[in-house]
Every structure is written in C-alpha cells, then in structure tokens.
UniProtKB/Swiss-Prot annotation:
Protein encoded by which gene: sthA
Enzyme class, broadest EC rank: oxidoreductase
Cofactors, names only: FAD
GO cellular component terms, A-Z: cytosol
GO MF annotation, one: dihydrolipoyl dehydrogenase (NADH) activity
Record-listed FAD binding positions: 35-44
Keyword field: Cytoplasm, FAD, Flavoprotein, NAD, NADP, Oxidoreductase
HAMAP family: SthA (MF_00247)
E.C. numbers: 1.6.1.1
Species of provenance: Photorhabdus laumondii subsp. laumondii (strain DSM 15139 / CIP 105565 / TT01)
Catalytic reactions of this protein: NAD(+) + NADPH = NADH + NADP(+)
Protein family membership: Belongs to the class-I pyridine nucleotide-disulfide oxidoreductase family.
InterPro entries (alphabetical): Class-I_Pyr_Nuc-Dis_Oxidored, FAD/NAD-bd_sf, FAD/NAD-binding_dom, FAD/NAD-linked_Rdtase_dimer_sf, Pyr_nuc-diS_OxRdtase, Pyr_nucl-diS_OxRdtase_dimer, STH_gammaproteobact
Protein name: Soluble pyridine nucleotide transhydrogenase
C-alpha cells in the first residue's frame, strides 16, 4: 500500500473529469485521476454519447442508401444487423479511448484504475481489482463520477431480454420487435435506431407528449416523423409489471393494456454514481437520485470537494460537463472562476432526423409575454438539401419584434446539431450585435444548409409591420 500526495484528485475520467484534470495540469498542479474501469472516457465514451451516436450514424446511412434513388432503385434493400453496426461503434469507442488516454499521458496526469472511497476531507482510498489498495491525498478533490441508468428494483434486469441503455450495447440476438420504456432523449434516440433497422418499436411515454422541454413544433415534428415511420407511441402510460418470458418480455400497463415484444429497453431516468464514494466520511449526502448540490463554482458544502457533470444533474450534457470541469479547476486553484457556463446551452438530440435548439421556446416566450416574431426556413426549399436528398426539416428563429434580438433557435432535420452553432454564435454577442439582421446582411456560401438562416431571417422580417 502506498501513500501518495497530489495537489488535486479527480474521481472519474469522463468529460467532466477530463476538463478538470486538463485545467489543473495547465495551471501547474500535480493531478491524480481515479477511474474505476480499465479504460478512460467514462460513460460518455463507452456506453452513452459516443456509441449511440455511432450507431445512429450507421443506421442513418443505411436509410439514406435505401431511400435515395441515386443509390437504390428499390429492387434491393440494404440491411444490417444490430451486431454489425455495433462493431462500427466499437471501432469509434477504441479510437476515442486511445485519444483520451493520450491526453492524460501527455499532460502528466497519474492514472489509477480502481474504486475510489473517501477516508476524510483530503484522503481517498483506491481499491484495485486484486483487492490491494493505495491511499491518495490532496488539497482539493473533484467528483466527476457520472451517472448510470436507473434500474427499478421490481424489474428483473438479469433476464436475457431486459436491457437498460448500458447493457443494450451487449445485445446478442436480432429482435423483430422491441419495447422502449421511457420516451426521453435516450428512448427516442434508440427508437430511431431500431426502427431504422426495420425493427418494430413500441415507445412507452410516461408523459403526455415527447420531449416536453423542446419547442412544441419540434416535439410535434418528431412525433409525426415517428408515427410516419411506423413507431407506435403510447403516451401517459406506466407499467404495473414487467414480465420476462422465454420468448421475450410482456409489459403490463396500469391502464390495463399489455404489450409483448422480443426484448425491452428500459430508458426511464438516471442515477448519479455516488453510492460507493463514502460521502458520509466527508459530510456530504446525495439526494434520492444520487445527485450532489453545488454552488456556482461547483463547490459542494465541503469546501475542499467539488463536483461536475452528470453527478450534479442538469444539464447532464457531455459538452457542459467538460466546461464545468474547466471552471471548477480554475476555482480550485484561484478561489473563484473568471469564466462561467454560458446561459444558453445548445441541446442536440440525435434522433433520425436530429433535433437541436438553443435559447427560449415559443411556449416560454408566450408565458413571459415577450413580443416575439418567428422566421422559418424549410429544408426542402434549400438547394443543398435538394442535392443531398435531405428535404425533411426546418429551421425556426424566434426574435424580438422591436429590438430584433434573437431569442431562440430551433432546428429539425439532418445536420441540425451542426447548424445550430451558427445561430448560437450570434446569440452570444452582446447588445446590438445580437440581431436577426446579421443573417440578411452577411453572405453565405451557396449552396449550403447554413443558408437556412438567411431564408428564415427574411421570412421573419417580412412578418413585421
């Protein structure tokens, strides 16, 4: 057993941990990074963002091949199994892991692969797979342990046909019909993936419409697209029992309905990874969802301990977690942070087609009694979309009628998560620089999807009187 001292300890090597570790070493601090698994990257790289987006990309290309007359004359259909596209995802995961491992090595972070448990405010025990352990100490410690799928105790996740969003990546059979319980971001993304592979999908939503945090038009567009593709959405439903049987799974709903399929993906909620940290030893307590409370510089109620990423809840985005880590690193060394997380964080939802938004929704602006106007552009009217055969989609700009300040941008369609950043860049400008007129007065490359901003801006300004 070793006793080793560092300036800072980072628990977790996902986006939040990486942001914190890189921020600390750039300020000349000695840093230990503790990762419970053998590979760095956290849930984002191995079970969440990277694999699901790699799967989605592969499926969307299959759909494009089968629907585009340039590639297919409908005499044959390109098919691929879930296992085959998983192999592609594994290649991307391996590339990401090697790259991130290199970040830590080049920057002199000391890596420890084991389970971290607090001993006191400055000491952490690291227990390894062989049951040996070391004790690390530091002036400051940051928790970036992420989250895991919520698994209710009355659901038998040991059954071979019942999965959560982590274990679904080990799917070893070819389902013809899948039930997805939970219609949040993860549930909707996997509904797109499975339907794109030709699998029947029942999407059980515990709420009254999809992704309620989105602008209503974006939510409605996704609902229609799902319906048009053959996904069966069951709103306002909750299970009373989930029964694993020999040939699949039966979901008994409280409404009296029963749904049977070859397998079930349970995707309803996540839990912070805090239960094994020994938080009581440092005077901390997680809430019922395993989440920690922090202040604006990501400091917990223990002044020596900080927390970032999924383990603190909203916004639970990999991009935000990395920035939170950088901000916390600055606060840990200087006592405060000169930079803060931006107010309007873009959201990307990688369904097929994808959705992205930044800023306020129409519902929010109406409730706030803000005099706004709407500018719209349909992808089907853009030359680049026609060339690429990506006619499904639209861009919507919400702006103040009097000041012309951009208040929100919402995009539905292929490349939405890329397109959104053009508008975000203008929204982040201060004062008169944030104006919808920028898109009219600038020159766009032609033909491009970005040109949707000019079309939407003209459409919106023409509504003013």
């Amino acid at each position: 057993m070793q006793h080793i001292h560092f300036d800072a300890i980072v628990i977790g090597s996902g986006p939040g941990g990486e942001g914190a570790a890189m921020g600390l070493v750039k300020q000349g601090k000695s840093v230990a990074v503790i990762e419970r698994y053998n590979n760095v990257g956290g849930g984002c790289t191995h079970w969440g963002t990277i694999p699901s987006k790699a799967l989605r990309h592969a499926v969307s290309r299959i759909i494009e091949f089968n629907q585009n007359p340039l590639y297919s004359d409908n005499s044959r259909v390109l098919r691929s199994s879930f296992a085959e596209i998983l192999r592609r995802a594994e290649m991307v995961i391996n590339q990401q892991t090697r790259m991130r491992q290199g970040f830590y090595e080049r920057n002199g972070c000391r890596m420890f692969s084991g389970e971290a448990t607090f001993i006191d405010d400055h000491r952490v025990s690291v227990r390894y797979a062989d049951d040996n352990h070391d004790i690390l100490s530091a002036d400051k410690i940051i928790i970036a342990t992420g989250s895991r799928p919520y698994c209710p105790p009355d659901v038998d996740f040991t059954h071979s046909r019942i999965y959560n969003s982590d274990s679904i990546l080990k799917l070893d059979h070819e389902p013809r019909h899948v039930i997805i319980y939970g219609a949040g971001v993860i549930g909707c993304e996997y509904a797109s993936i499975f339907r794109g592979l030709g699998v029947k999908v029942d999407l059980i939503n515990t709420r009254n419409h999809l992704l309620a945090f989105l602008d209503q038009e974006m939510s409605d567009a996704l609902s229609y697209h799902f319906w048009n593709s053959g996904i069966v959405i069951r709103h306002n439903e909750e299970y009373s029992k989930i029964e694993g049987v020999d040939d699949g799974v039966i979901v008994h709903l409280k409404s009296g309905k029963k749904v049977k399929a070859d397998c079930l993906l349970y995707a309803n909620g996540r839990t912070g990874n805090t239960d094994t940290l020994g938080l009581k030893n440092v005077g901390l307590e997680a809430d019922s969802r395993g989440l920690l409370k922090v202040n604006k510089i990501y400091q917990t109620s223990n002044e020596n301990i900080y927390a970032v990423g999924d383990v603190i809840g909203y916004p639970s985005l990999a991009s935000a977690a990395y920035d939170q880590g950088r901000i916390a690193a600055q606060a840990m060394t200087k006592g405060n942070a000169e930079v803060h997380l931006i107010e309007d964080i873009p959201t990307g939802i990688y369904t097929i087609p994808e959705i992205s938004s930044v800023g306020k929704t129409e519902q929010q602006l109406t409730a706030m009694k803000v005099p706004y106007e709407v500018g719209r552009a349909q992808f089907k009217h853009l030359a680049r979309a026609q060339i690429a055969g990506m006619n499904v989609g639209s861009l919507k700009i919400l702006f103040h009628r009097e000041t012309k300040e951009i208040l929100g941008i919402h995009c539905f369609g292929e490349r939405a998560a890329e397109i959104i950043h053009i508008g975000q860049a203008i929204m982040e400008q201060k004062g008169e620089s944030n104006t919808i007129e920028y898109f009219v007065n600038t020159t766009f490359n032609y033909p491009t999807m970005a040109e949707a901003y000019r079309v939407a801006a003209l459409n919106g300004l023409n509504r003013l009187f």
